[in-house]
Curated annotation (Swiss-Prot):
Belongs to the universal ribosomal protein uL24 family. Gene3D superfamilies: 2.30.30.30. Keywords: Ribonucleoprotein, Ribosomal protein, RNA-binding, rRNA-binding. This is Large ribosomal subunit protein uL24. HAMAP family: Ribosomal_uL24_B (MF_01326_B). Pfam families: KOW, ribosomal_L24. One of its GO terms (cellular component) is ribonucleoprotein complex. PANTHER family: MITOCHONDRIAL RIBOSOMAL PROTEIN L24. GO terms for biological process: translation. SUPFAM superfamilies: Translation proteins SH3-like domain. It comes from Glaesserella parasuis serovar 5 (strain SH0165). The gene is rplX. CDD domains: KOW_RPL26. One of two assembly initiator proteins, it binds directly to the 5'-end of the 23S rRNA, where it nucleates assembly of the 50S subunit. GO terms for molecular function: rRNA binding; structural constituent of ribosome.
Length: 103
């Protein structure tokens, strides 16, 4: 099945502590989660690894968020939108449901 949200899509968060924030999808995970730039920041405590020259400490990084909690952002309407699929010239393409524009 084709993915409705793909890497480099601009999305808006629908639920959770970052509700209403926008960001670019940096990674799509196979378990139905996405990593969004600047969203769902966690603080991870890392141990130092002298053999690799890694310093320990607190590291802030982006955690995965469920794909159902984000929606693709439509720049023309400035709102979250739904995604549909159709065939154009024998290729399957995604389009915004609100204004039928190809993504």
């Amino acid at each position: 099945m084709a993915a409705k949200i793909r890497q480099n899509d601009e999305v808006i968060v629908l639920a959770g502590k970052d509700k209403g924030k926008r960001g670019k999808v940096t990674k799509v995970l196979p378990n139905g989660k996405v990593v969004v730039e600047g969203i769902n920041i966690i603080t991870k405590h890392e141990k130092p690894v002298p053999a690799l020259g890694k310093a320990g400490g607190l590291v802030k990084k982006e955690a995965a968020i469920d794909a159902s909690n984000v929606a693709i952002f439509n720049p023309e309407t400035n709102k979250a939108d739904r995604v549909g699929f159709r065939f154009e010239d024998g290729k399957k393409v995604r389009f915004f449901k609100s204004n039928e524009k190809t993504i």
